[in-house]
């Protein structure tokens, strides 16, 4: 336990970690405020709102209609707010819409701002793909201001990419630094060092990784809850995220799979980093090699398919991407299994390499 605490202290007291934690958290705040909140727009009673004001206005008008979604409620929204019809070149979304009539246009008309198609036809709930999806699972759609969850999922990917960088920079030094500073002979000269040094380093590294995962998830959750609110989680993910999925999946199930894959992504990245660190005699060299290993699957995926595609999708950089659940939903447990086996293999390989140095 003493060695574990010492290793954990070294990881958290590292200047690179302290500076990196402040920088990445700051970047997360900036991205949230300027890219997410700053991009919100809403038009109510002819008045245009943007940024935080738009969020507040959208939340306010949605409260009036919150509840089970019916054709009558859709008609009331259209009567009160109309349907949006204004588009601007190279600008996303309806420029004269709000959360409610944007929602109605997307699911109950033929309008689609992505394709520049104005709404000209109106559909009943039972005629829509949304209605059919809910009939398939035997539930009723619940109208609520779900943008908070949509932003949470978008922010999660950005936050965990930043967290991955912190893990690479922090954990890469855990073994390599001992070789670089010529401390290995001293560590292995004691009985405690020979028996407990490696388990302490590994346990400290995974604790460090779990902390980083929880930090970015928690910060993201609090930001979205405070500004957007987090309602509508009882719906299917398609309705919450405005992204079509091949089959209706409840958002909570989608979120559970997403967080589980993201957690395993960071844990496996930690295992890969430990393996490289055990082989390297330089902290800088370890960081560079791990960074290359982390980003290389993106390049491989561009040129290969088939079984290679499946293996590449199980790598850490892809498991933190929000679109991964839709891509691998039918086989997510296979992808997770590949990742777990790969992580265990890396950890064992690194452990053997580091132990070999004990007898060198």
Task: Report the location of each language-model feature.
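Residues that define the loop-to-transmembrane-helix transition and helix capping
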Residues: 15-18, 195, 283-284
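Central hydrophobic cores of alpha-helical transmembrane segments
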Residues: 21-25, 284-297
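Juxtamembrane non-transmembrane "cap" segments at the membrane-aqueous interface
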Residues: 226-237, 296-315
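Junction motif at the cytosolic side of a transmembrane helix
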Residues: 5-14, 275-279, 341-360
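Secretory targeting signals
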Residues: 23-69, 101-178, 199-279, 317-336
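Short, membrane-interfacial amphipathic segments enriched in basic
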Residues: 1-4, 141
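Membrane-interface helix starts
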Residues: 8-23, 289
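Short helix-to-coil transition segments within interhelical loops
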Residues: 188-194
